[in-house]
């Protein structure tokens, strides 16, 4: 009897080859689909990272889209100066020029209608300009850790002349600096290095967290954002709770969650620019009384990094990938995200048995 291969055997071998090919293709397709979850406490920079993805990977904001942010820029600017002026009363700081008290009254009288209309009328921009130039207002701004103030306050107020122009169109940087509280889940899609990313930005305030849970299934990596500059601030929603401590508590619960045993965890220690400005004026012992190092950027930032990384209870099997970031700096985010993507590619290929 010869060793001829029957037609059935040949067909079976072909089928088997085809199944293997399909499995491999499915594996490669799965390895190319990346589900990224952006987590972190409120105001840690998650939404700014999402905006950067649009700028870096999707041609940025069109002129029309930038125009739509004009009302948000005005609202952020008005809210910022109002927060400072209100805080002056609580902190018992007087205006350097008593005439500014009239401007403060004007500010509160005009701001409501301006915000509703998404405008910055000339009389209101004049009021804001005079208030912002007052030494008493500047002294109060210098104590902003004692009340709630947007990070972008000085950015907009210092540039009032430009944004108050009647033909003003926000720049990409203006858009990046806007602050709108994220409620619910914002999903962004983009392609980079032959990977198809789905990025989910989840509201960070406590009231938002119960909405996170169903997002977790099948997630490739978590980017956890921490505002380095929040070490001397309290929460907007709980004035007893230090923001950095809240962030550590949340990171602990995410990093050691049984659901995320196989999920890459990437830690963005964000707002490094604000932290560098602040650390020489406001000691780290406000947040960590046991800290004995210098109030210098490198030493203090390394200490915070070790505090977060030490929360990882599975150091032997789980690595935390830490990066220092400035979410409003496009080049920095581009550089960091490139490194993050390489880690994801490597881990993905490993999971699919292709590495």
Swiss-Prot record:
Which residue intervals make up region (G1 motif)? Answer: 35-48
Looking up SMART domains in the UniProt record yields:
G_alpha
For the region G4 motif, what residue ranges are annotated?
266-273
The Gene Ontology terms for molecular function here are: G protein-coupled receptor binding; G-protein beta/gamma-subunit complex binding; GTP binding; GTPase activity; metal ion binding
Q: How does it sit in the membrane?
A: Lipid-anchor
User: What keywords appear on the UniProt entry?
Assistant: Cell cycle, Cell division, Cell membrane, Cytoplasm, Cytoskeleton, GTP-binding, Lipoprotein, Magnesium, Membrane, Metal-binding, Myristate, Nucleotide-binding, Palmitate, Transducer
Tell me, which GO biological process terms does this entry list?
adenylate cyclase-activating G protein-coupled receptor signaling pathway; adenylate cyclase-inhibiting G protein-coupled receptor signaling pathway; cell division; cell population proliferation; G protein-coupled acetylcholine receptor signaling pathway; G protein-coupled adenosine receptor signaling pathway; G protein-coupled receptor signaling pathway; gamma-aminobutyric acid signaling pathway
Positions annotated to bind GTP: 40-47, 176-182, 201-205, 270-273, 327
List the PROSITE patterns hit by this protein, alphabetically: G_ALPHA
Q: Where is the lipid attached (N-myristoyl glycine)?
A: 2
Which residues are noted in the entry as Mg(2+)-binding? Answer: 47, 182
Recorded GO cellular component terms are: cell body; centrosome; ciliary basal body; cytoplasm; cytosol; dendrite; exocytic vesicle; heterotrimeric G-protein complex
Q: Where is the lipid attached (S-palmitoyl cysteine)?
A: 3
- Chain residue ranges for the region called G5 motif: 325-330
Q: Which domain of life is it from?
A: Eukaryota
Region called G2 motif, residue ranges: 174-182
Q: Where in the cell is it found?
A: Cytoplasm; Cell membrane; Cytoplasm, Cytoskeleton, Microtubule organizing center, Centrosome; Membrane
Where would I find the G-alpha domain in this sequence? Answer: 32-355
Note the PANTHER family from the entry: GTP-BINDING PROTEIN ALPHA SUBUNIT, GUANINE NUCLEOTIDE-BINDING PROTEIN G(I) SUBUNIT ALPHA-2
Q: Which purpose does this protein serve, as stated in its record? A: Guanine nucleotide-binding proteins (G proteins) are involved as modulators or transducers in various transmembrane signaling systems. The G(i) proteins are involved in hormonal regulation of adenylate cyclase: they inhibit the cyclase in response to beta-adrenergic stimuli. May play a role in cell division.
Provide the assembly information: G proteins are composed of 3 units; alpha, beta and gamma. The alpha chain contains the guanine nucleotide binding site. In this context, interacts with GNB2. Interacts with UNC5B. Interacts with GPSM1. Interacts with RGS12 and RGS14. Interacts (inactive GDP-bound form) with NUCB1 (via GBA motif); the interaction leads to activation of GNAI3. Interacts (inactive GDP-bound form) with CCDC88C/DAPLE (via GBA motif). Interacts (inactive GDP-bound form) with CCDC8A/GIV (via GBA motif).
The similarity annotation says: Belongs to the G-alpha family. G(i/o/t/z) subfamily.
Q: What is this protein called?
A: Guanine nucleotide-binding protein G(i) subunit alpha-2
